[in-house]
């Protein structure tokens, strides 16, 4: 015969385990501290320094959150702290006549890296490219870059792009809390995937949530440099991860300089998120001052 006390203990343990694994307890799930890297610039695009924790208004899903950690980083001025950048070359949609332009843009970016910076180049169709390396290896991959094999070659599917972003983010997640930047040079279909609807056209919604989730944990933001004239509207992976899209410029060099500037000047804010079972959370960061512009990720996964 089973004794009363052991039986009650076993029953309580089983009941608690069932509760913790049930869908109804999703709102009580354990959450990690959320880190948000924030770039603040003035009207001239120059970094705004000297801000304090109380200068920031941060909200998740519309609710104010209390900042628990606050770090101001200016690694561009500290030669002992590396910046982190991965350049993604679109070799799927860019025709051969654009190869020289893509190479020139990528080369300019690579040459701005300091010896201490972490820089790598990956090509969309090359599965062997890893987001690690040095400037010499990066320049070699740029020289090896080739455009699409056919002028009207099928473009990479949105889910393929999102899976690549997730893979790069995952590999860089272990490199610390510092900001990482993924710069895609190419066409919108690869470099600026639009956000899917949850139901309408949302066959890659799961890939979207995975990509923004891992990118948020890795502090990775995506920037896009559209190397050919393109008509495009926002609300995509670039905006969701806190990056910028550059296009239709007669001189891209100041824009490329801006990317390195953002990699080296930013604020890192940390907060405990409100309990929620939503798949995707919206993030809003504001600095209630005149003549300042705030750039930060807009979404994170659960």
Residues of each region from the PLM?
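Bacterial N-terminal signal peptides
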Residues: 10-22
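Scaffold/interface architecture of coatomer-like assemblies
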Residues: 24-302
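Bacterial N-terminal signal peptides that target proteins for export
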Residues: 1-13
